[in-house]
């Protein structure tokens, strides 16, 4: 392969390895460059190796300790719940990954999980973080919006539609995803006995959820159920979808306390003060019968073998949530200020006041953002118009009384009035 330019012969060479055209089988020309067949093969090998490495990292089954360590990066406290979740999730995906190797010798059941705990204690965050760590599609549903098919409200199949959409319509990926259903305690049946009227948003929803939670071939409408009745349905196997169900279950502790003797009545009965027994201790002792008495049907409870609880967050927990996780609120605001070349600092008392306000609102960790937004609104509104500010200090007076922050300039310190 030679090229004549202006009557002179010039040997062409690979722009990458510098081998001449006579040393290789083929030389491919580009705009001002050449690449030989050997370099093309080497590039393909490098790309294939990197892709295989990425797939291996993605497909490798994390150990329970590795899963918990990843959860620790984003979720403060709740160590027992994280340990139980890590083991359950590890066993679930072990069942998924090694299904063929197991054959028909032993049938491993799904490790669906029930998370009990007050609002703002981190139930949703735990489920979200698990999906992020495992790199699987994730969907959240609110149980209070669900009804039986044919009634006003969301069909349970719409949960699967959302998961499929979040998986970019990759049915294989969606079939190994995680679905978190919040407020599951709100679909408890009304009364202890079977209802003579149709309970379409309570026991009826539990019945509708049974099959997809256990594992079934579900027909789902890719565009949602009721607005597009003529669409073709997609079949999705839910056998390998991990379901995490969460709820506050207010009053469940009293049921446990009564069963375990704390609510004894009658002559000679030992009088026990409910306040003497911590909430966490009672929730550690939850039995399936307690959940039945609360209002979940036995068949539904049978599909959720793993039950754990998250503790109510105290002031110290909330302060740690503000500052320690990778996506901590304080870090987020500091990064925003850093883009304006300003250092943002919170005093210890300011953080304590923010946590205290969230506790007063009874919103837990979820309320921290709302408190922070209220505190930072005026500061973030005026800061871009101020020149020469190099540091902004948020103290207790800013949080509790709405005072201006301490602003430190390049040449002088100025304290807001």
From Swiss-Prot:
Entry binding sites for Zn(2+): 14, 17, 36, 39
Molecular function via GO: ATP binding; ATP hydrolysis activity; ATP-dependent protein folding chaperone; protein dimerization activity; unfolded protein binding; zinc ion binding
Residues covered by the ClpX-type ZB domain: 2-55
Any one GO CC term of the record: HslUV protease complex
Gene3D superfamilies in the cross-refs: 1.10.8.60, ClpX chaperone, C4-type zinc finger domain, P-loop containing nucleotide triphosphate hydrolases
An example Gene Ontology biological process: cell division
Keywords: ATP-binding, Chaperone, Metal-binding, Nucleotide-binding, Zinc
Pfam families cross-referenced by the UniProt entry: AAA_2, ClpB_D2-small, zf-C4_ClpX
Coiled-coil boundaries: none
Binding site residues for ATP: 118-125
CDD domains xref list: RecA-like_ClpX
Entries under InterPro entries matching the protein: AAA+_ATPase, ATP-dep_Clp_protease_ClpX, ATPase_AAA_core, Clp_ATPase_C, Clp_protease_ATP-bd_su_ClpX, ClpX_bact, P-loop_NTPase, Znf_CppX_C4
Domain of life: Bacteria
Family membership: Belongs to the ClpX chaperone family.
Assembly information from the UniProt record: Component of the ClpX-ClpP complex. Forms a hexameric ring that, in the presence of ATP, binds to fourteen ClpP subunits assembled into a disk-like structure with a central cavity, resembling the structure of eukaryotic proteasomes.
Function, as annotated: ATP-dependent specificity component of the Clp protease. It directs the protease to specific substrates. Can perform chaperone functions in the absence of ClpP.
Protein name from the UniProt record: ATP-dependent Clp protease ATP-binding subunit ClpX
């Amino acid at each position: 392969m030679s090229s004549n330019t202006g009557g002179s012969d010039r040997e062409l060479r690979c722009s990458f390895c510098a081998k001449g055209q006579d040393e290789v089988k083929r030389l491919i020309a580009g705009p001002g460059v050449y690449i030989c067949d050997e370099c093309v093969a080497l590039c393909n090998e490098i790309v294939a190796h990197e892709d295989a490495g990425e797939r291996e990292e993605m497909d490798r089954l994390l150990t329970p300790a590795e899963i918990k360590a990843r959860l620790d990066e984003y979720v403060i406290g709740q160590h027992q719940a994280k340990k139980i979740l890590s083991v359950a999730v590890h066993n679930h995906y072990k069942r998924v990954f090694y299904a063929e190797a197991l054959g028909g010798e032993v049938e491993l059941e799904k490790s669906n999980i029930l998370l009990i705990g007050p609002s703002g204690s981190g139930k949703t965050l735990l489920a979200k973080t698990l999906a992020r760590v495992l790199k699987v599609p994730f969907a959240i549903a609110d149980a209070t919006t669900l009804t039986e098919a044919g009634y006003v409200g969301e069909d349970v199949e719409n949960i699967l539609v959302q998961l499929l959409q979040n998986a970019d319509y990759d049915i294989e990926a969606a079939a190994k995803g995680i679905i978190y259903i919040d407020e599951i305690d709100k679909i408890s049946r009304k009364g202890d006995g079977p209802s003579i009227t149709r309970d379409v948003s309570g026991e009826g929803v539990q019945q509708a959820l049974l099959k997809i939670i256990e594992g079934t071939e579900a027909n789902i409408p890719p565009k949602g159920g009721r607005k597009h009745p003529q669409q073709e349905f997609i079949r999705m196997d839910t056998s390998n979808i991990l379901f995490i169900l969460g709820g506050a279950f207010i009053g469940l502790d009293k049921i446990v306390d009564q069963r375990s003797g704390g609510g004894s009545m009658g002559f000679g009965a030992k009088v026990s003060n409910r306040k003497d027994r911590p909430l966490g201790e009672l929730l550690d002792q939850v039995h399936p019968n307690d959940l039945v008495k609360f209002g979940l049907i036995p068949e539904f409870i049978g599909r959720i073998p793993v039950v754990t609880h998250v503790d109510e967050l105290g002031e110290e927990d909330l302060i740690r949530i503000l500052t320690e996780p990778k996506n901590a609120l304080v870090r987020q605001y500091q990064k925003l200020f850093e883009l304006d070349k300003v250092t943002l600092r919170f005093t210890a008392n300011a953080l304590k006041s923010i946590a205290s306000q969230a506790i007063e609102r009874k919103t837990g960790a979820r309320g921290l953002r709302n408190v922070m937004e209220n505190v930072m609104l005026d500061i973030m509104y005026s800061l871009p118009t101020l020149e020469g500010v190099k540091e902004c200090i948020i103290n207790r007076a800013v949080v509790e009384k709405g005072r201006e922050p301490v602003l430190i300039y390049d040449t002088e310190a100025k304290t807001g009035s």
